[in-house]
Every structure is written in C-alpha cells, then in structure tokens.
Amino acid sequence: CAGALVAEKLPHLKHVIRMGSEKSAGMHNFSAVCQLGSAAEFSQLDVIEGQLHANDPINIQFTSGTTGNPKGATLSHRNILNNAYFVGQNMHLSAADRLCIPVPLYHCFGMVMGTLCCVSHGATMVLPCEAFDPQPVLQAVQDEQCTALHGVPTMFIAELDDPNFAHYDVSSLRTGVIAGSTCPRELMKRLISDMDLAGIVTAYGQTEGGPVDTMTELDGAFEAQV
C-alpha cells in the first residue's frame, strides 16, 4: 500500500514522499500528504505563521574556524533566502536547469547556494554522492545532463585530473559557482576549455554573510573571474 516502504538495503527508511500526481508502491504522494492535516492543525499553522518575521533566526551555522575557534553565526530567513535568490539570479538559473551539488549540505555552500538556490528558482537538484568523489560527480553530470556544477577549487581540480575525465560527456554544463578559496588562473582556463564552464562565477564571502558577500558576473571578463 502507499507509504508502506520495506527496503532490504535501507531497513530504517520507512517513508518516501514523491512529487507529482502519480502513485508508486511504497511511496506517499505529496498532494495526498498535504491533505492529511486537520482544520485545527491548519489553524495552528496560521497562528505560528503570524508570529514569524523575516528577520527571525532560522539557522545557526558554524564557521570553519580557520582564524580561530568555530563561531556560531546566526542567520535569518531574509538573509539566506535573499542570498540564495540572488546567487541564482546571477547564474541565470531557471526551471530548465539541473544543478549538481557535490558540496556538503551541512555547509552554507550546499545549503544556501545549492539546495535553497534551486528551490527559489525551480531548478532541479542533483546530489551525486554521499561524500565528494570526482567520478560519481562526473557520472551524474553526464547521466543527468546537469547544466550547472558547484565546487571549491580542489574539487574541480580532482574532477579535471581524474584519469577517466575524457570519457565523460560534460558538454551540458554552462554555469556553476566556484568558491571557498581563490581560483587559480590556470584552473579557470581549464574550467572554460575542458568543462565548457564559460559561465562559471566566482563567489566570495563568509559564513556570517550567509555566505556570499560578492560574486563575479556570469558573462564577466576572464580577468574579473580570477
């Protein structure tokens, strides 16, 4: 029956909610789940919504601790939503895009610039692997025809230097974000020539900024990107 999931390899997974109107064995349908709430619960939701403000804290994101002990940065709804929205706008992201997100979701790169960026623009999220591995990332870009790819410089270097890189078709890529540290000039040249990422943008920021403070333009000159 719907929602009665029994997975031998994932015994602890009990519920899967699928989008769309179709029904699948072992899965809940999203529209049906939306109808499960009672009138009293919807009334309670209205009360809670009335008490919330855009500047209320939504997340305490810990910094990396490169200049001292990690600090808990308190981020607001307005902060991370605007950050994600404007990153997507700068990438010209739309519902036609498929963003590959190999960066960790517990970090502001994956959480804000990845998942929330997709949600705010209707783009598809592609999560290639549990922990970064260049081959699953390249495979996902090829199989899912990803149009965008995020990563820090060392991730992109690992992908480009993978022995099997030439066997993957990454021609669907057009944009993405490189951040976390300065992008070397030679790496930017390789991203443009070998991964078709002429539209990649460089982001600079800090956790406290949620995380992007400034970034280059999609069609900016090469010198501006590095």
Give the predicted meaning of each segment.
Residues K9-L13, R18, S24, H28-S31, ...:
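Conserved pre-ATP/AMP-binding loop-to-beta segment of ANL
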Residues L81-R98, C108-A148, D162:
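Conserved AMP-binding/adenylation subdomain of ANL enzymes
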Residues C1-H12, D196, A221-V226:
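Short, flexible, glycine-rich and Lys/Arg-enriched loop motifs at helix boundaries
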Residues Q35, A123, D143-G151, L160-V226:
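Gly/Ser/Thr-rich phosphate-binding loop
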Residues P57, T63-T66, L99, L105, ...:
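Conserved S/T- and glycine-rich ATP-binding loop of Class I adenylate-forming
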Residues A40-S43, A54, N59, A73-S94, ...:
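Conserved structural elements of the adenylate-forming
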Residues D46-E49, P134-L138, I157, F165:
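Short hydrophobic/charged patches on amphipathic alpha-helices used for structural packing
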Residues C1, K71-T74, I101, T124-A131, ...:
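Short beta-strand->loop structural element characteristic of the AMP-binding/adenylate-forming
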